[in-house]
Amino acid sequence: QFFYVFHMPAFFIISGYLYRPHDWKRTIVSMMTPVVVFSLFNLCFQILISFLKEGCYDSTDLFRRIMVPYIGGVADPNVDYIVLFMGAWFPIVLMLVRLVVGDIKAFSFVGRYKVAVFLVVMAFMVTLPLWADMNNDICQMKPFLMFPSLPFFLLGMMLHDVDTQMLHKWLKRLVPLFFIVYLFMAIWNGRVEILNLHFGHNYLFFFIGAVSGSAVLFWLCSHFKD
C-alpha cells in the first residue's frame, strides 16, 4: 500500500524531467522493440513447454487471448488470457505520452503549453468519476492510462524548467512536510494503482500523495548520493 502510492508516478515524473524530443518513429521502435522481442520469446517458450507436457498447444482464439492484456478492455472471466509481458502497460503508456508531448510535431503544443494542459488533464481526472463509469470499455483500455499518467510526466517537465539548486533547496526544506502528507495519504486514501484506475477517494488525493512520496524518494536518492 505504501509503495503503490508513488512507485509508478515517480517513474513518470523522472521520465518527464529527463524528456528530450525525438523522432516519433525512433520513440516507437525504442519503446516497443523490447516488448515485442520479450513477448515473442515468452510465447515460444510457453508453446514449447506445452508441447513437452501435453503434446499440443491450445491456440483457440489465440490473437484475442494475447492482445487483450496489451490493449486492455473489459476482460471476459471465461477466457484464459496469455500474459507475455508483465508490466507492458508502462512502456506502452510512456510511449504514448512521449508521442503527444512533442515527439509527434502535430501535438507539440502539449509540451509548449504544459501548464495549461496539466490543469486541463487534472480537472478531467478529478471530475471523471462524477460523470463516467470507470469500468466501461474505454476506461479499461490500456491507452486510456495515458490520462492519469500525463500529469506526472508534465510535472517532471515543469520541474526541469526550475533552477536545479533552487529545486534541491526547496526539496530539502519541505521534505518533512512531504513525508507527513505521504504517510497520511497512504493510510487515509487506501491502496492506489494507476493500472487498475484505483485512486482512492479521488484522483486529486492520489496525485498529492504520489507527488509527496516521490519527493521523499528523490530527496533520499540525492541524500545518499551526497
Predicted feature locations:
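Alpha-helical transmembrane segments and their immediate juxtamembrane cytosolic regions
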Residues: 1-226
